Design a protein with these regions (language model features):
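Glycine-centered hinge/linker elements that transmit conformational signals in sensory
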Residues: 200-201, 252-286
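Extracytoplasmic/periplasmic substrate-recognition and gating elements
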Residues: 79, 165-167, 275-278, 315-378, ...
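Extracytoplasmic "Venus flytrap"/periplasmic binding protein-like
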Residues: 70-152, 184-192, 293-295, 302-303, ...
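Conserved C-terminal helix/tail region of periplasmic/extracytoplasmic solute-binding proteins
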Residues: 404-458
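Hinge/lid segment of periplasmic solute-binding proteins
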Residues: 34-43, 111-177, 196, 212-218, ...
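Extracytoplasmic/periplasmic solute-binding protein
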Residues: 155-174, 178, 198-258, 301
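Short, solvent-exposed loop/beta-turn-alpha elements that line the ligand-binding surface or hinge
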Residues: 45, 128-140, 189, 215-227, ...
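Long, aromatic- and glycine/proline-rich binding clefts that accommodate carbohydrate-like moieties
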Residues: 325, 374-423, 431
């Protein structure tokens, strides 16, 4: 019986081995019938994507859509949500929506909002690596405007403050300045000095209009030179002040105690404005009595002081052919305009600063600057030699002329106290232009008004 059981176990074991031996016809690898043998890499599928929100002034969204598409070619795992926000509104709204998490990681604003935004604890200082990158590419004036010396402990922008540190706070996107626009059908060679311009103005203003009114061009309000703003706008008048040696807030434009209204240079400029400029631009009229913008668009006057924001209207004006020249000198002294910039910054309390920094750095790239020019027509805030890389800019003579003007411009003051400069400055010019106030008196009043506003009145 034992022998029989042993035989049965041996036979069962042999049968099992035969059953487990693979058939020679069977494949050695099992192929998934669904993917047909394709090896799938799930790395990208399961990579965690991050998200940032950007507030950029782009109402129809086409510009930002194009920028984000290019950004995602470099950073595919950063989702960028764009919300249109006016550049002059972003700072105030971020103060409201930022703390709740409904603000922006990146926001855009003009140059004169920077210091206030820093004081309001809204701006994250950009790292040294970003500053180094931008130093190789960015227009020097624009970079200067975006850089501040700030003592966070004492909330002071005085470079001499004990804990002051100079940092880059924003990425300049575009840069701008006023210039001398002229009708090329009325002027073949633009004036390079105000003396030359005024000599021609005296002849022009005295001419009789050909419309049958029997009035002179001046009586019609068609003065030889106009302004697209008004003659009490200190931003537009800075070139004139500069020719007499006046720049607000000291030589570095950063000393709030040295606004400079009550200086000999300011008084000399006001005297020239009263005696030389006013008679040839408004006659006996007030600072805002002439509609020079409409006159220039209609082809009725040769010159107007304007900025890049005027191009859209002037280019759309039927029959108007114009160009832009450098601001003329006065008494042999060069005139220096203010350079302004639009910039983008990282919100100080963003939950994703690293990706926000990548985005603002990308805004400085050639492709982002090219898209800004294509969609917005603005002069990229790049070094002049890099403008050649931006398609279309080298053929746009109007922008190139502004770039030339910017070579002698001074950066717009960015200290918070600049907010209190414009009001007294405008009143000072109005008093001299409209009200017959002596320049020295108007300057002293402006100085006192400014000092009262910033709490420095004695």
């Amino acid at each position: 019986m034992k022998k029989l059981l042993s035989v049965l176990f041996i036979l069962f074991g042999m049968a099992t081995l035969v059953a487990c031996t693979p058939d020679e016809e069977d494949p050695t690898d099992v192929v998934d019938p669904v993917n047909n043998g394709t090896i799938i890499d799930f790395g990208d599928t399961f990579t965690q994507k991050s998200k940032i929100r950007v507030w950029i002034d782009d109402e129809n969204g086409e510009y930002m859509e194009a920028v984000i598409a290019e950004f995602n070619k470099v950073y595919p795992n950063i989702v960028v949500e764009h919300q249109h926000m006016g550049s002059v509104d972003a700072r105030e709204l971020l103060k409201t929506f930022g703390p709740s998490g409904n603000g922006a990681d990146v926001f855009q604003f003009p140059h004169d909002h920077l210091a206030q935004a820093v004081l309001e604890d809204l701006v994250y200082p950009l790292p040294v690596a970003t500053q180094t990158l931008l130093a190789t590419r960015t227009n020097a004036l624009a970079l200067q405007i975006a850089t501040l010396s700030y003592d966070e402990t004492n909330k002071s922008f005085d470079p001499a403050s004990p804990n002051a540190v100079e940092r880059l706070y924003a990425v300049p996107m575009s840069i701008e300045s006023v210039g001398l626009f002229y009708n090329t059908d009325l002027v073949s060679t633009p004036a390079t000095t105000f003396e030359e311009l005024f000599a021609a103005a005296d002849i022009w203003n005295a001419q009789i209009a050909t419309d049958g009114s029997n009035l002179t061009y001046a009586q019609k309000g068609w003065f030889y030179l106009g302004t697209s703003s008004h003659w009490a706008d200190s931003y537009f008048m800075q070139p004139i002040f500069s020719a007499f040696g006046f720049t607000p807030f000291g030589p570095n434009l950063d000393d709030p105690t040295a606004v400079g209204f009550e200086s000999a240079e300011t008084i000399a400029a006001l005297t020239w404005i009263r005696d030389q400029l006013k008679p040839r631009t408004t006659g006996t009229g007030n600072h805002n009595s002439v509609s020079a913008g409409a006159n220039f668009e209609a082809g009725k006057i040769p010159y107007i002081i304007g900025g890049p924001w005027n191009h859209e209207a002037y280019q759309a004006a039927e029959g108007l052919n114009y160009a832009v020249a450098q601001m003329p000198s006065i008494n042999g002294n060069a005139t220096q305009t203010f350079a302004g910039a639009i910039m983008a910054a990282v919100y100080k309390y963003s939950d994703n600063k690293e990706d926000a920094i990548k985005f603002v750095e990308f805004l400085n790239s050639d492709i982002a600057m090219e898209l800004q020019y294509e969609y917005k027509g603005k002069l990229p805030a790049l070094k002049s030699e890099l403008l050649e890389n931006i398609e279309g800019v080298s053929e746009n003579q109007l922008l190139l002329d502004m770039a030339t003007q910017l070579e002698t411009s001074v950066p717009m003051p960015t200290i918070p106290q600049v907010t209190y400069y414009w009001g007294p400055g405008e009143t000072m010019l109005i008093d001299v232009w409209n009200n017959g106030v002596a320049p020295a008196t108007a300057a002293a009043t402006a100085e006192a008004s400014y000092r009262t506003r910033i709490g420095l009145a004695s």
